[in-house]
Design a protein with these regions (language model features):
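Loop/turn-rich, solvent-exposed surfaces of beta-rich toroidal or solenoidal domains
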Residues: 306-340, 344
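Internal, well-ordered domain-core segments that constitute the primary functional module
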Residues: 93-166
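N-terminal domain-start signal
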Residues: 12-18, 31-65, 79, 83-90
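Solvent-exposed loop and edge beta-strand segments that line ligand/cofactor-binding
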Residues: 24-44, 73-88, 123-136, 190-207, ...
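Terminal, non-catalytic domain-edge segments
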Residues: 1-21, 152, 159, 215, ...
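Well-ordered alpha-helical scaffold segments within catalytic/enzyme domains
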Residues: 1-8, 45-59, 91-104, 139-152, ...
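Extended ligand-binding clefts on enzyme/binding-domain cores
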Residues: 152-278, 283
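Long, well-ordered core segments of solenoidal/helical folds
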Residues: 13-33, 64-81, 108-127, 158-176, ...
Length: 404
């Protein structure tokens, strides 16, 4: 019999308590704070959690407050910047997610003006801005792929593919990659901006670009071009893997550097493994899936010390670990992934038992302090989403983080 993830009665009670606490805190934040409207750290991300909390237990959520703030989000769309993190790409993703959650009342015209706005604003050849997902071009892919479930997004995805093609570095052996732009805020080496720098994180690097391109293989007019990009990029990415089997990490944070990286969504082996597995399954490349499984299983042996886990959030915290192993097990069912998910859930709930609500605080590496964070990526909202997913195995929201 396959190994199963399980929660004890006491753990279920603890999660129920946590969800009540988190819902109350996020509801207070939504009601009283002057929040930016973004998905990753603002109102949209907190509304996403409240929606899932309502599905879990409707009594936890003030429906009138949710409706009021969702209306405010929609009314403020014309005042937003465009990027995923705080801008329109993330907010519009949420609106499409909620639109699709009610199939009988789905409104196909709700976001057509946003489609056109993005098509026009992103159509620059060659692309000159950021290429990663938080502030850059790859961050428009979650919206485009979510919209493509219900409408033809050939034009919008075509613009995204054009931009990423225009910035790609191609090698004679067929490998393809992307160097961080010279003016990128995410460059590690800002002193030598003309030197190529190949970031290996899902949030800011090549794995994220691969994940952003992947849904476009479902679009007939783009399939051939996108397949070429994906195969060249995955082959390049696998060449960056360490040959040192004693290292904690298979990949570093940047190509050519030391093979040391944390466990997390943002950087590290886990989301590289996830991305390779998804491409391998989509393009029928079993070798990618095999390598992904090896990388994921290697990472499953790491704990909070070797994984540099210092807080709770989705980005690189212990609740984020539970969700990532949950997704890996959905992609590549394996007892070791179930065990790793169990480990991080047990660890997370034990932290709450020992430290209370402060165990949920976000760690700020600049001032070396823990603080409350109400947001999706680093704070309460994301932790709450992770907890609801433990009960129903529904990770249908993770496409906004390029994990589906």
């Amino acid at each position: 019999m396959a190994e199963q993830f399980s929660l004890s009665t006491q753990q279920r009670d603890t999660i129920n308590t946590l969800l009540a606490i988190i819902t109350d805190k996020v509801s207070t934040s939504v009601r009283d704070a002057d929040l930016p409207h973004g998905l990753l750290s603002g109102l949209a991300g907190q509304l996403l959690f409240l929606y899932k909390a309502y599905e879990y237990d409707a009594s936890l959520v003030d429906e009138a407050l949710f409706t009021e703030k969702l209306d405010a989000l929609q009314e403020g769309l014309d005042q937003q910047s465009f990027e995923m993190s705080n801008g329109l790409a993330g907010q519009a993703w949420l609106l499409e997610y909620l639109n699709q959650a009610d199939p009988e009342n789905y409104d196909p015209e709700l976001l057509e003006e946003i489609d056109e706005l993005f098509r026009e604003s992103l159509d620059h050849q060659p692309w000159q801005g950021e290429i990663e997902m938080v502030l850059g071009l790859s961050g428009f892919a979650p919206y485009a792929s979510r919209r493509a479930k219900q409408s033809d997004q050939t034009a919008l995805y075509g613009v995204i593919v054009n931009g990423l093609e225009s910035t790609a570095t191609r090698f004679d052996n067929g490998h393809i990659t992307w160097s961080q732009p010279q003016e990128s805020v995410y460059r590690f080496n800002k002193d030598e901006p003309t030197e190529p720098e190949y970031n290996l994180g899902l949030a800011h690097g090549v794995p994220g670009i691969i994940a952003a391109l992947l849904p476009a293989v479902q679009i007939p007019a783009l399939k051939e071009r996108v397949t070429t990009l994906l195969l060249g990029a995955c082959d390049w990415l696998l060449e960056q893997q360490s040959t040192d089997c004693t290292s904690h990490s298979c990949f570093g944070s940047s190509a050519g550097g030391e093979h040391h990286s944390r466990l997390g969504w943002c950087y590290g082996d886990l989301t590289i493994a996830m991305t390779l597995a998804r491409v391998g399954q989509q393009l029928d490349r079993p070798s990618y899936v095999e390598r992904a499984l090896e990388i994921g299983l290697h990472a499953a042996g790491r704990d909070e010390q070797s994984g540099h886990i210092t807080d709770a959030g989705l980005c690189h915290g212990f609740y984020g670990m539970a969700v990532i192993y949950q997704i890996l097990n959905q992609l590549m069912p394996h007892p070791r992934f179930v065990q790793a998910m169990q480990y991080w859930v047990d660890y997370s709930l034990r932290q709450y038992t020992e430290r209370g609500v402060e165990s949920l605080y976000s760690y700020n590496g600049l001032d070396k302090a823990y603080n409350e964070d109400f947001g999706f990526l680093m704070g309460y909202a994301g932790i709450g989403l992770a907890l609801t997913s433990l009960f129903d195995d529904d990770t249908g929201w993770v496409d906004c983080l390029l994990m589906a």
